[in-house]
Amino acid sequence: MERTFAIIKPDAVERNIVGKVLEKIEAAGFRIVGMKKIQLSKKEAEGFYYVHSERPFFGDLCSFMSRSPVVVLALERENAIAKWREVMGATNPANADAGTIRKEFGLSIEENTVHGSDSPESAAFEIPYFFSQLELL
C-alpha cells in the first residue's frame, strides 16, 4: 500500500463542500489514515510550499492557503499518488477532465479545491509536515 498527502483548500472549506470532496476520496478507494482541520499561519504555508519560493505566485499562494482553515489528509491505497492525481484532475479546473474534483468544484487555477503530493519524495515530506506517526492509523 502506498500513501499520499492531500489538502482540501480554503476555497472548499469556505464553501462547505468538504463532505462532498471526502465522498469522492472514499469512492475512489482511498482509506483516510489521517485527517484534521487546521488553520495554517503564513509562515507554515511558506515552509510547506518552500519548493515554489522562487516562483512569482509564491506570496499569493501562501496568503491564500493561510486565509482560512484547510483539511489535511493522509490517504492510502495501491498506487495512491498517481490515483490521487487522477481523481484531483488538472491544476487548472478549465483543463480538468469531467468527473474530477477540480472540474466539479474548482473555481480557478489557485482556488482549485485540493492539493496532492506529486511524487513519493513529496509525500515523504508532506505527510510528516502535518502528522506525527501517532496520528496515522
From Swiss-Prot:
Subcellular location, principal: cytoplasm
Residues that, per the record, bind ATP: K9, F57, R85, T91, R102, N112
Source superkingdom: Bacteria
Active site residues of this protein: H115 (pros-phosphohistidine intermediate)
Catalytic activity, as annotated: a 2'-deoxyribonucleoside 5'-diphosphate + ATP = a 2'-deoxyribonucleoside 5'-triphosphate + ADP; a ribonucleoside 5'-diphosphate + ATP = a ribonucleoside 5'-triphosphate + ADP
InterPro entries xrefs: NDK-like_dom, NDK-like_dom_sf, Nucleoside_diP_kinase, Nucleoside_diP_kinase_AS
Signal peptide positions (record): none
Pfam families the UniProt entry points to: NDK
Cofactor(s) listed in the protein's UniProt record: Mg(2+)
GO terms for biological process, alphabetical: CTP biosynthetic process; GTP biosynthetic process; UTP biosynthetic process
Recorded GO MF terms: ATP binding; metal ion binding; nucleoside diphosphate kinase activity
Keywords noted in UniProt: ATP-binding, Cytoplasm, Kinase, Magnesium, Metal-binding, Nucleotide metabolism, Nucleotide-binding, Phosphoprotein, Transferase
Uppermost EC category: transferase
GO cellular component, one term: cytoplasm
EC number in record: 2.7.4.6
Similarity-based family: Belongs to the NDK family.
NCBIfam families referenced in this protein's UniProt entry, alphabetically: PRK00668.1
Purpose: Major role in the synthesis of nucleoside triphosphates other than ATP. The ATP gamma phosphate is transferred to the NDP beta phosphate via a ping-pong mechanism, using a phosphorylated active-site intermediate.
Subunit structure: Homotetramer.
Protein's UniProt name: Nucleoside diphosphate kinase
Record organism: Geobacter metallireducens (strain ATCC 53774 / DSM 7210 / GS-15)
